């Protein structure tokens, strides 16, 4: 049993484990190849059918678990596949450099752009260094500095959202967490360049919103976006964290539900089984959508761009 796999993935993993064992057997005894290949093909078909069955009926809570999957690609993973010549920029020029947010200049199909996103970290050491993707004020100030730099040089901004929320520690509060987020919200409404935001995992509360005020808001199929985590909501409403699955359902945190509510623009499809199963395919889907969005926004004059962005967020809550 793979402890990094989710409960509903385990039946699929068992079949894939059998396939892997049979492949090793072929490697050791070529004479068995013909019979074993038939068995492998049968198991592969069974795996696809089972995966389709499971993933066609996921609950909101299961999607939330997928959004947090240990193997799910992060911002730097997508940057490597989508952008060329990425050059990371560091520091807020006030306090320090927050590793929970990464950003820098890259090229999208040879066009210079600014890329900013949350980065959670893969192993324990990196998770600690990046504070599990929970940014402190200096992270949001860094993001704002890069956004203003992008405006100065007329670079489109692409943001990738993947955070449980802004860091709630005492130090962060003392250094101005709330005002750092507020300044980002205010600034992003007035930047006179295209801003395209994509939720790739968790979109948690103000920590997500601080870099997701844009002209286009996209979500990967198995990502989530909410004012509070399902566990947090359950703890407040029912005083019981075990009610998190119910909270996830009631809150409407999934991409398709948020699309219905007109809170996001596009749901980007993921490969069968989720983004962690095929990062290349997922990256192609994201890049395709980013290019489509950019073509649309490039056609707008500055005044129209800003007016449309303002109206977009003023219409939140009116379905």
Swiss-Prot record:
GO process annotations (BP): fatty acid biosynthetic process; malonyl-CoA biosynthetic process
GO MF annotation list: acetyl-CoA carboxylase activity; ATP binding; carboxyl- or carbamoyltransferase activity
Chemical reaction(s) catalysed: N(6)-carboxybiotinyl-L-lysyl-[protein] + acetyl-CoA = N(6)-biotinyl-L-lysyl-[protein] + malonyl-CoA
Pathway note: Lipid metabolism; malonyl-CoA biosynthesis; malonyl-CoA from acetyl-CoA: step 1/1
Cell compartments where the protein resides: Cytoplasm
Cited Pfam families: ACCA
Superkingdom of origin: Bacteria
GO cellular component, one term: acetyl-CoA carboxylase complex
Segments forming domain CoA carboxyltransferase C-terminal: 43-296
Primary localisation category: cytoplasm
The entry's keywords: ATP-binding, Cytoplasm, Fatty acid biosynthesis, Fatty acid metabolism, Lipid biosynthesis, Lipid metabolism, Nucleotide-binding, Transferase
EC numbers for this chain: 2.1.3.15
The protein's enzyme class: transferase
Similarity-based family: Belongs to the AccA family.
Subunit structure, as described in the record: Acetyl-CoA carboxylase is a heterohexamer composed of biotin carboxyl carrier protein (AccB), biotin carboxylase (AccC) and two subunits each of ACCase subunit alpha (AccA) and ACCase subunit beta (AccD).
NCBIfam families: accA, AccA_sub, PRK05724.1
PANTHER family in alphabetical order: ACETYL-COENZYME A CARBOXYLASE CARBOXYL TRANSFERASE SUBUNIT ALPHA (PTHR42853), ACETYL-COENZYME A CARBOXYLASE CARBOXYL TRANSFERASE SUBUNIT ALPHA, CHLOROPLASTIC (PTHR42853:SF3)
Primary role: Component of the acetyl coenzyme A carboxylase (ACC) complex. First, biotin carboxylase catalyzes the carboxylation of biotin on its carrier protein (BCCP) and then the CO(2) group is transferred by the carboxyltransferase to acetyl-CoA to form malonyl-CoA.
Name assigned to this protein: Acetyl-coenzyme A carboxylase carboxyl transferase subunit alpha
Lineage: Bacteria, Pseudomonadati, Pseudomonadota, Gammaproteobacteria, Enterobacterales
Gene: accA
């Amino acid at each position: 049993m793979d402890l990094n796999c989710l409960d509903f993935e385990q039946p699929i993993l068992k079949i894939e484990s059998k396939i892997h064992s049979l492949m090793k057997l072929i490697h050791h005894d070529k004479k068995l190849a013909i019979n074993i290949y038939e068995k492998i093909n049968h198991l592969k078909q069974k795996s696809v059918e089972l995966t389709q069955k499971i993933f066609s009926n996921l609950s909101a809570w299961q999607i939330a678990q997928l959004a947090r999957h240990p193997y799910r690609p992060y911002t730097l993973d997508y940057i490597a596949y989508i952008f060329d010549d990425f050059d990371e920029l560091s520091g807020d020029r006030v306090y320090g450099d927050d590793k929970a947010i990464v950003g820098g200049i890259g090229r999208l199909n040879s066009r210079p752009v600014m890329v900013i996103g949350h980065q959670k970290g893969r192993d324990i050491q990196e998770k600690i260094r990046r504070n599990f993707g929970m940014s402190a004020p200096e992270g949001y100030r860094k993001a704002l500095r890069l956004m203003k730099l992008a405006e100065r040089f007329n670079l489109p901004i692409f943001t990738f959202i993947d955070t449980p929320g802004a860091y709630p520690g005492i130090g962060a509060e003392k250094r101005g967490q709330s005002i750092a987020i507020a300044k980002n919200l205010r600034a992003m409404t007035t930047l006179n360049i295209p801003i395209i935001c994509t939720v790739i995992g968790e979109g948690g509360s103000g920590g997500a919103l601080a870099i997701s005020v844009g002209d286009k808001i996209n979500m990967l199929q198995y990502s989530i976006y909410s004012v509070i985590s399902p566990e947090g909501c359950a703890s407040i409403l029912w005083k019981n964290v075990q009610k998190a699955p119910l909270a996830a359902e009631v809150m409407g945190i999934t991409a398709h539900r948020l699309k219905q509510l007109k809170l996001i623009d596009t749901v980007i499809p993921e490969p069968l089984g989720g983004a962690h199963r095929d990062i290349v395919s997922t990256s192609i889907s994201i890049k395709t959508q980013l290019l489509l969005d950019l073509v649309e926004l490039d056609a707008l004059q500055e005044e129209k761009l800003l007016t449309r962005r303002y109206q977009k967020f003023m219409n939140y809550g009116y379905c």
